[in-house]
Amino acid sequence: MYRSIIKPILFSLTIERAHRAVLILLRAIGLIPGGRWLLRKCYAVKHPALEREVFGIKFANPVGLAAGFDRNGEAFRELAALGFGFVEVGTVTPRPQAGNPRPRVFRLPKDEAIINRIGLSNRGLEKTIQHLRRPHEGFIVGCNAAADYLKLFRNLYQYADYFTVNISCDNSCREGATHTREHILRILDPLFDFRRGQNQYRPIMLKVSPDMPDAVIDEISDILLETPLDGIVATNGTHNREGLHTSRTTLDKIGSGRLSGAPLTQRAVEVVRRIHTRSGGNFPIIGVGGIMTPDDAKAMLDAGADLLQLYTGYIYNGPGLVRDICRALVADAEAKAAEEKAAAAQATAEQPAVQQAAAEQTAKEQPAPQSAETQPEAENAEPAPAESRTPAQSGPDSEQPES
């Protein structure tokens, strides 16, 4: 239904108008009695195999929605009903920001990608708090912050379940800026200090760019080992335009911006795998970038991600993508459980045969008992020299060497 009816309608609009229409529709559904229940009935998948506990937080499933879709926290409860295990709102700034001039978001249908230079367009801290005050027990809401990190952290601390520090955002630091260890710690240390004085613990994640050199990725991974940082979100969009099917003329006309979607899949998985390997698999990773299919999701998890986030794949494939990923993960878990059960059953079935074979082997190794008629003769016989005596020559009453 999404691909045949809804997607053509949405794709006939500019991407920002389509996005706004979806948020308005979701909020309207949420106001209808039973509206969110109907969404859950159609799209949500619940299964114990999907449940995760990451940085001390329990997630109903590992599939989340990346920052940028619900920038102001307007529809996170309706998005939860669509099957997401968590939603990251933002990017949030202290004051409302209009962002960059339009047009600023572009679809690349031939590549299943989007180019975005929207900037930090959001309605500001106060409006976000107003939305996050709505009850959301049992559902995880993260908050993505760029610039003025400490102010946002303090004001949103009681409303969000975790925080993402978005150092990869071009709007909080100049494009191509080098993210040295000192630069990152200047951002993080005040947040750690504030958190130490609170009664509740809020995990802090660091979001990285796929365009960072591997050496910088390694240095950021090492920060996990040296600080109270809880994990990494990998990755943001890329400025790379290599290998696209969209014409160079079209790309030049669009201009600058971060590319997300299918062209990012391979690099995002590489970055996640590198961080996982470098950190010894001991720290949480949220994998995001180019997850367009259930197979992409499984590849990201296999690379070391603990949780996933969707964005562009959700736009191109619709709400059924979350359901399809969750179903695929459940099917894999059930298949693995069935294999383990079959292996255990086979081992149990083979156990009597193994025990019988062992008993027979033991019996063969036992010395043959001597008959009563031969015992006296054996007792009167000259004992064989110790070095040449064999088990066959030793009767049950023969003296055995100490073991």
Regions found by a protein language model. Name each.
Residues 113-116, 122-138, 180-201, 253-283, ...:
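Alpha-helix-loop-beta-strand connector modules within alpha/beta enzyme cores
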Residues 1-141, 146, 325:
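N-terminal capping/small domains of soluble enzymes
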Residues 58-64, 137-143, 197-212, 277-287:
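Short beta-strand/loop segments at the ligand-binding rim of alpha/beta enzyme cores
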Residues 88-94, 167-169, 231-239, 291, ...:
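Glycine-rich phosphate-binding active-site loops on the catalytic face of alpha/beta enzymes
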Residues 96-112, 242-255, 313-337:
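C-terminal helical cap(s) of enzyme catalytic domains, especially alpha/beta-barrels
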Residues 36-45, 170-183, 223-281:
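Glycine/Thr-rich beta-alpha phosphate-binding loop at enzyme active sites
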Residues 145-151, 177, 205-226:
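Active-site glycine- and acidic-residue-rich loops that bind
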Residues 74-79, 212-226, 281, 291-308:
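Catalytic cores of alpha/beta
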